[in-house]
A protein has these predicted regions:
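Conserved Nudix-box catalytic region and its N-terminal flanking loop in Nudix hydrolases
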Residues: 45-52, 84, 94-138, 155, ...
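Unchanged
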Residues: 82, 91-94, 125-211
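Short, low-complexity, intrinsically disordered N-terminal modules
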Residues: 1-3, 17-19, 27-30, 46-47
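Acidic, metal-coordinating catalytic segment for phosphate/diphosphate chemistry
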Residues: 53, 57-94, 100
Length: 226
């Protein structure tokens, strides 16, 4: 694989790279480094800890259908030369659909990496040229058949910032009307509404094991539910 110079890459570029399966240049993710120095140097440490590593080279070592794996050679703000490996991903939209009666719509599907069926919120990768809202609308329609009159982004987070570039956008979907689902050929999805108390109980007893779903539901119940 060819050596590359430091460059910046957009999330849409990542999607193109995944589609083409080509090696591309990229920049390493920001890194912060702790410094156990004396209290007198706290101010200088605060400034240094927010500096980004210098990227010496970047290689795509794997290009699959869903994500890329990059290996970057970097110099940390401390001067340490090291290797950083990360998964490049264009981001995902996660939908929390609330029916007119207040129930929350969850889906169940088989997640191959876990070797089990999981209950979770509607979610999917943001395709090239899509906004998080457009991706949310598409995923909701495909996986459940429901259409929503209103979407509102209420939370953004990185699920695994240690090595995964993916950013998740959680959107509240309201004003739902039913329709015909349009799942992918390899998807077998069951959609089912639950009351707020039922969803809370599913979290309490461990029936909900999907992190994005737990985060989204708890945030909604704590700050948004009326």
């Amino acid at each position: 694989m060819p050596n590359t110079e430091e460059s910046k890459i957009s999330r849409y570029d990542v999607r193109r790279m995944i589609a083409r399966g080509k090696m591309k240049n990229s920049s390493a993710a920001p890194s912060r480094r702790e410094n156990p120095g004396a209290r007198a140097s706290a101010r200088s440490f605060s400034s240094a800890s927010h500096k980004k590593p210098q990227v010496l080279s970047s290689k795509t070592v794997y290009a699959g259908k869903v994500f890329l794996i990059r290996r970057d050679e970097v110099i940390e703000p401390s001067g340490l030369r090291t290797t950083r490996e990360m998964i490049a991903h264009p981001g995902s939209a996660v939908v929390l659909p609330v029916l007119p009666d207040g129930r929350i719509l969850l889906i169940q599907q088989y997640r191959y990496a876990t070797r089990q069926y999981l209950w979770e919120l509607v979610a999917g990768r943001i395709d090239e040229g899509e906004t998080p809202r457009e991706a949310a609308e598409r995923e909701l329609r495909e996986e459940t058949g429901y259409r929503a009159k209103r979407f509102k982004t209420f939370l953004e987070f990185f699920p695994t910032p240690g090595f995964l570039e993916e950013k998740m956008y959680l959107l509240l979907a309201e004003g739902l009307t039913p329709g015909k689902a349009e799942p992918e050929d390899d998807e077998k999805i069951i959609a089912r509404p639950y009351t707020r108390k039922q969803v809370e109980q599913m979290i309490r007893n461990g029936k909900l094991q999907d992190a994005k779903t737990i985060a989204g539901v708890l945030y909604y119940l704590r700050f948004l539910a009326r």
